[in-house]
Regions:
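Short linear sequence elements within intrinsically disordered, low-complexity coil regions
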Residues: 36, 64, 142-144, 169-170
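Tandem repeat scaffolds
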Residues: 1-86, 99
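Intrinsically disordered, low-complexity segments enriched in glycine/proline and serine/threonine
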Residues: 21, 41, 109, 146, ...
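Non-catalytic interaction/regulatory modules that flank or connect domains
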Residues: 70-152, 159
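Extended catalytic/binding region for NAD+/ADP-ribose chemistry, centered on the ART fold
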Residues: 153-175
Length: 176
């Protein structure tokens, strides 16, 4: 393989490319097109893949650390709606929850406890919120929410699961 560390590949079209057994640490691949590419056995630790197109990309045997902790309970944040207004939901992802992240910062889990729900303006606490994508998925303070159809494939970023970010600011800035 090749030493590709610190290379700027932002906005590059690598669709259908084959990149095998390379050292791809600290590469900027933001906005790159990797659709249908075969990336096998690459070390992609600390690679910036924000807004990268990865439809049907093969990441077989690649080293891509998850954005969320692989073990233990932790806090996550997501954007939802309360009476038509954007709110932030603070989630406690339990130790036994399934969790994943693809190549970016957005994470998913199969269950979480709703710790608090805050308005975007004024940080006022509210009792419930609904999903931005599914009005029947309701978050209630103090209750556990579950996604029974959680998709185990971590590289399907927008698949079934409770979507969240580790960092509150990322959730605040997220535009669904």
């Amino acid at each position: 393989g090749n030493d590709m560390r610190h290379t700027d590949l932002s906005s590059i079209n690598l669709s259908h490319a084959k990149l095998i057994d390379n050292d791809m640490r600290w590469i900027d691949m933001s906005y790159a097109d990797l659709r249908y590419a075969k990336l096998t056995g690459n070390d992609m630790t600390s690679t910036d893949m924000r807004y990268t197109y990865t439809r049907d990309t093969c990441f077989e045997d690649c080293i891509i650390p998850m954005a969320c902790p692989s073990d233990g309970a932790f806090i996550g944040w997501k954007k939802a709606r309360h009476c038509g207004e954007a709110v932030l939901v603070k989630l406690l992802i339990p130790e036994d929850a399934k969790r994943s992240s693809a190549t970016g910062r957005k994470c998913r889990c199969d269950k979480a406890k709703v710790v608090e729900i805050l308005t975007m303006k004024g940080n006022i606490e509210v009792e419930f919120a609904v999903s931005v994508y599914n009005d029947s998925f309701v978050y209630k303070k103090g209750k556990v929410v579950c996604e029974p159809n959680f998709c185990e494939d971590r590289f399907k970023e927008c698949a079934e699961g409770i979507h969240f970010f580790i960092d509150r600011k990322e959730a605040e800035n997220y535009l669904p």
